[in-house]
Amino acid sequence: MDATVGQALPEWRLEAVSPEKMKLFAAIARDPNPIHWDRDAVAERGLGERLINQGPTNLGYVVNMLLAWTGPASLRELTVRFTSNVFDGDEVVAGGVVTAVREDADERLADCEVWLDRGDGTRAVAGTATVALG
C-alpha cells in the first residue's frame, strides 16, 4: 500500500448512533454513568435531552476507519482528544489526512491527523495516528 502527504483517508460513516447499543455497551462495560442510558439523568445534568455516546465507542469509530484503510494489526500509535459529545441519533463520520510518510526499522509508516465529526460538522474527536502501510 502506498500513501502520500495530503492524501485524504477513506471516510468511515455511521448513519445514526444507536441508543440501544449505548445501553448495551454500558451494561457490558459496567459503566455506571446514567448519561448513556437515562434521558432524565442527561437533562438533570444540563446536557440536553439525548443520550451521550461513550468516549471509547467514539474512539472505536476512528480505529474502524484506520483499520478499514490499512488492515488489521496496522495501528502503531493513536493519540486523541475528546472535543465534544456525540448523541444518540447523530450521524458520525471518521476521517483523516496523511501528514507524513516515513520508514522506521522494517516498516513503512504513515502519520495522520484523524477525527470524528458529527453530522452537523462538530468535531467530537481529534488527534493523530501512525499506521503501518504493509
Task: List the model feature ranges, each with a label.
Residues 41-47, 82, 127-130:
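Short C-terminal domain-edge/linker segments immediately following a structured domain
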Residues 1-11, 85-134:
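HotDog/MaoC-like acyl-thioester-processing domains
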Residues 1-74:
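Hot-dog-fold acyl-thioester-processing enzymes
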Residues 35-41, 76-77, 104-106, 121-122:
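Glycine-rich loops and low-complexity Gly/Arg-rich segments
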Residues 66-94:
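Mid-chain, well-packed structural core segment of small domains
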Residues 33-35, 60, 76-77, 82-83, ...:
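Short, intrinsically disordered/low-complexity patches at protein termini
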